[in-house]
UniProtKB/Swiss-Prot annotation:
Keywords: Cytoplasm, Elongation factor, Protein biosynthesis
Main location: cytoplasm
Pathway as given in its UniProt record: Protein biosynthesis; polypeptide chain elongation
GO terms, biological process: peptide biosynthetic process
NCBIfam families, per the entry: efp, PRK00529.1
Transmembrane domains' residue ranges: none
Signal peptide: none
Gene: efp
SMART domains with a match to the protein in the record: EFP, Elong-fact-P_C
Reported function: Involved in peptide bond synthesis. Stimulates efficient translation and peptide-bond synthesis on native or reconstituted 70S ribosomes in vitro. Probably functions indirectly by altering the affinity of the ribosome for aminoacyl-tRNA, thus increasing their reactivity as acceptors for peptidyl transferase.
Subcellular localization(s) per the UniProt record: Cytoplasm
Originating species: Magnetococcus marinus (strain ATCC BAA-1437 / JCM 17883 / MC-1)
Any one GO MF annotation of this record: translation elongation factor activity
Protein name: Elongation factor P
One cellular component term from this protein's GO annotations in UniProt: cytoplasm
């Protein structure tokens, strides 16, 4: 059980018999009255976001979820298949479950899959990925305003902004949390 003071961003809790992740937690101690914690939680099953308030005497159960590194194999049109490289066990996630991560899916890459009651319920991409540029406009010579960017599409299908010198076929490091270009890939 988590007391109201242990409710922090990133903790996973069980509310209404479903796993949720705390997105935001604010501890409030009013001048008069009882202290409370206001949390914003996201359902790991369906992505809904709700707010809940817990008094200082309240507690909430921890969600018994496990994060496992799994390799993305393929999409059969309906389900996205992942494999645990250690046990070769395979799991499948629906389109809705991979919705936030779909634009970063690349075959044979390793992702963090969340399991609850031995079912895959969520997938998170690595923080940084090295991807190849498949579409972008050519950089015009002399068009070198400091910090200028142009739209580009990477091999996973995500759209990002890249500096003018980046060409089709270049490999770039991308922050998947923000969708921002970081640097050219080394090697």
């Amino acid at each position: 059980m988590l007391s109201h003071t242990e409710m922090k961003q990133g903790k996973r809790v069980l509310i209404d018999d479903q796993p949720w992740i705390i997105v935001k937690a604010d501890f409030v101690k009013p001048g008069k009255g009882q202290a409370f914690t206001k949390i914003k939680v996201k359902n790991l099953m369906d992505g809904r976001v709700i707010e809940r308030t817990f008094k200082s005497s309240d507690s909430v159960a921890k969600a018994d979820v496990v994060d496992v590194e799994m390799q993305y194999l393929y999409n059969d049109g309906e389900l996205y298949h992942f494999m645990n490289p250690a046990t070769f066990e395979q799991v499948a996630l629906s389109e809705k479950q991979v919705e936030e991560c779909k634009k970063w899916l690349k075959e044979n890459e390793v992702y963090e899959v969340t399991l609850w009651e031995n079912r895959a319920i969520n997938v998170v991409p690595p923080s940084f990925m090295i991807l190849e540029i498949t579409e972008c406009e050519p950089g015009v010579r002399g068009d070198t305003v400091t910090g200028a960017t142009k739209p580009a599409v990477v091999e996973s299908g995500a759209s990002i902004k890249v500096p003018l010198f980046v060409e089709i076929g270049a490999r770039v490091k991308v922050d998947t949390r923000t969708g921002e270009y970081m640097e050219r890939a080394k090697g």
